[in-house]
A protein has these predicted regions:
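N-terminal pre-domains immediately preceding structured catalytic cores
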Residues: 2-262
Length: 262
């Protein structure tokens, strides 16, 4: 066997060996009402961070986006917006409004750090997604491991040690970002309804059906009257409303249970 064929065979064997799996692409998911940014590897959750989204008057945009680069130690330039009138340029530094790093996902909108720790978990920004500085640094390190491996951990440490010098890192692969607005969520047998922070009238029967289906439930025989009763109990609340699915919809079964039933 030639040297070339030997190398190919060894590489193939390594990939197919038990316990050796190729890393799946990382993607980010933000459901605005939950104020949490979730990191997925394939379909597996690997990280979850509390965030601050845009306030009702300056909502965070929803849709599908991608992150192409990171700016470490960013400056802040007031955008051409009414709310920024009279604001002054802020150079890079520990107290910069952008924090230690910002991740661009669409013009004028970023995922970034913040010195305003108390804002995390609330709709408080002008549309950007704010994170605790420690969290956005940890997230950015993870993205660099997958999409910019040429920038080492030691190099990032050196960048962070000089907070007044901005450094841009371009990713070799785009990081997918999904931002959605779904106040009704079903997880681990519990149905939760988050405050409708943008007053979109988004707590409704269709949203309940969708959340239950996404949670693995068979909604074919779901009683519409029970759904309407639940919506009336849950809507227009300022805090999270949650109950076990079995309590809200007593006769509802998961799809797996429905299939296995005699």
């Amino acid at each position: 066997m030639s040297l070339r064929n030997t190398v190919i065979a060894l590489a193939t064997a390594a990939l197919l060996a038990p316990g050796v799996e190729a890393q799946e692409l990382i993607r980010l998911d933000l459901n605005i009402p939950t104020s949490r940014l979730v990191v997925y590897e394939g379909d597996r959750v690997i990280k979850s961070y509390p965030v601050s989204v845009g306030k009702a008057s300056h909502g965070t945009p929803d849709g599908n986006f991608s992150i192409t680069h990171a700016d470490w130690n960013p400056d802040w330039r007031p955008p051409q917006r009414e709310w920024a009138r009279g604001r002054e340029y802020t150079p890079p530094g520990l107290n910069n409004p952008m924090g230690r790093v910002k991740l661009f996902f669409m013009p004028l909108y970023f995922i970034h750090g913040t010195p305003e720790k108390e804002s995390i978990g609330t709709p408080a920004s002008h549309g950007c997604v704010r994170m605790l500085n420690a969290d956005v640094v940890a997230l950015s390190r993870l993205l660099h491991e997958r999409a910019a491996p040429h920038v080492t951990k030691a190099e990032i440490d050196r960048i962070l040690a000089n907070p007044r010098q901005t450094r841009r890192v371009n990713f070799r692969e785009e990081i997918a970002v999904s931002i959605r607005y779904e106040p009704v969520v079903v997880e681990n047998g519990t149905i939760r309804v988050y405050p409708d922070v943008y007053d979109r009238k988004a707590v409704h029967a269709e949203g309940v059906y969708q959340a239950l289906m996404m949670g693995g439930y068979d909604v074919a025989g779901l009683d519409m009257a029970a759904v309407r009763t639940f919506v009336e109990r849950a809507k227009n609340r300022r805090t999270v409303f949650q109950v076990p699915v079995a309590e809200a919809f007593a006769s509802l079964a998961t799809r797996a249970e429905a299939v296995s039933a005699p």
